[in-house]
Amino acid sequence: MRSVTPLIDSVADLWDSHAAPPADDLLAQLLYASHLLGANRAVANFGGGNTSAKGTALDHTGRAVPVMWVKGSGSDLATMGAEHFTGLRLDEVLPLVGREAMSDGEMVAYLARCQLDPAMPRCSIETLLHAFVPAPHVHHTHPDGINVLAGTADGERLVRECFGDSAAWIPYIRPGFTLSVQVGDAFDQGRDASLVEISCRDSRSAATRCA
């Protein structure tokens, strides 16, 4: 039988529980995961992708409040430091789920007012995608394997064949408020929170994995 050489190498799980920061250090764990993802350019191209984690942190008054740490604009997963994440007060962000529409400018301005510290990096237009997904950890990347699969003419059928009902297919829509709502809705429709979400972007696609 003729052997077949895969066009895309499989992606190894590099998480090392001994090397990873303790679970109670949420930001350090997020940075560790981000570096692992960014180290493989077949998973996250330079400057592409973003990661987030939800938990609690102290605000400027010293109160513990629900927050989401998310990669800020202009940083790279492989080389970023903890200072490149932005902390957002979730109790101020989540009410946006009820809005019907929001421009990019309105969204960026609103999120700036939700930051724990105004000196933190500016949020990307994909920040609400992370906030609206009901999972504590969200890793959003552009892996080569998903690009090849979802970017074909028959991409939707192939994605469903590979991932079954655990995958949500969202036809191309420009990143921003509407896409964030659609992704959040896809996760709310009875799917397991560890699913892979596929978003087709013409010749580009994105995979969002949650846990």
Each model region followed by its residue ranges:
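Glycine-rich flexible loops
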Residues: M1-A211
